[in-house]
Amino acid sequence: LLERMALLDIDCIGLDWTIDMADGRRRINSVQEKAVQGNVDPVVLFASEDAVEDAVRTVCKKAGPKGHVLNLGHGVLVGAPEEKVKHFFDVSKTIKYD
């Protein structure tokens, strides 16, 4: 399905948390280069701050330095602690690429 989506006249494809970011990007870009959005598992917001940081850094590393919109793979789930949502954004602001 990702390969077919890559043929559409769109700039960015959102990936949910069930798709490995590196694999999704590889499959999409094997057809046509597109930006990708996602795909941190939204359940991580119920885990520790260390788990949130690890998830954000892992997704960013797999996505690479160009053409990635960091986001949750679904959205903020009801009941997610606001301090974890804030931490998600705080960590995202520290991401640097060499």
Predicted regions and their residues:
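Active-site loop segments of alpha/beta catalytic cores
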Residues: L1-D98
